[in-house]
């Protein structure tokens, strides 16, 4: 019942840290789904760096999103995000968050002030917020993304909105 652990397992357990979910380059890292969404832009930044690109990330959305604790997890990982040139700025509402993320894709319009080769963005919100952002999404889609940019939209269903129950 309390048999000693094999040396290899004991050593592996001694090296585990709570930051592994954001810093481990290979092997197993245990994390929740929300923590995986926090790690996602860090992995994109590392992929870009391996391709010789100097990119940054920008995350915005609505704090009332059903993606519970996403904003809290982003704040908790602030030092890891900053080390990868990733900024988290929550929006006052879904539309302002989406508009801010869309703005990151206009980097190529101002080549004289470019600090980065590209900026990738993440927008998050609730289902009704997707409806509210349709104008921003339509215009952003028509404008496209920066050459070395791109955007991911994460949406969760609102618990009181029958049209968006998940």
Feature map (PLM): residue ranges:
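Conserved small/polar residues in nucleotide/adenosyl-binding loops
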Residues: 163-166
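Cofactor-/ligand-binding subdomain signature composed of acidic, glycine-rich
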Residues: 2-32, 43
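Active-site nucleophile and cofactor-binding loops and adjacent substrate-binding regions
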Residues: 30-31, 60-65, 86-99, 123-128, ...
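Gly-rich Lys/Arg/Thr-decorated short loops/hinges at beta-loop-alpha junctions or inter-strand turns
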Residues: 14-25, 52-55, 76-84, 117, ...
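Glycine-rich phosphate/diphosphate-binding loops that line cofactor/substrate pockets in enzymes
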Residues: 13, 38-55, 110-116
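Anionic-ligand anchoring segments at beta-strand to alpha-helix junctions in alpha/beta enzyme folds, i.e.
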Residues: 52-96, 115
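Active-site-proximal alpha-helical scaffold in enzymes
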Residues: 102-110
């Amino acid at each position: 019942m309390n048999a000693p652990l094999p040396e290899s397992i004991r050593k592996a357990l001694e090296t585990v840290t709570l930051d592994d979910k954001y810093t481990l380059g290979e092997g197993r890292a245990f994390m929740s789904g929300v923590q995986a969404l926090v790690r996602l832009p860090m992995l994109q930044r590392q992929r870009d760096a391996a391709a010789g690109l100097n990119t940054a990330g920008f995350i915005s959305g609505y704090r009332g999103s059903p993606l519970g604790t996403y904003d809290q997890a982003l704040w908790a990982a602030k030092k890891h995000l900053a080390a990868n040139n990733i900024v988290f700025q929550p929006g006052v509402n879904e539309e302002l968050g989406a508009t801010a993320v869309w703005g990151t894709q206009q980097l190529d319009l101002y080549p004289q002030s470019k600090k980065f080769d590209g900026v990738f963005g993440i927008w998050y919100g609730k289902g009704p917020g997707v409806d509210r952002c349709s104008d921003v999404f339509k215009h952003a889609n028509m404008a496209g993304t920066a050459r070395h940019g791109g955007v991911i939209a994460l949406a969760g269903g609102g618990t009181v909105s029958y049209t968006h129950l998940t």
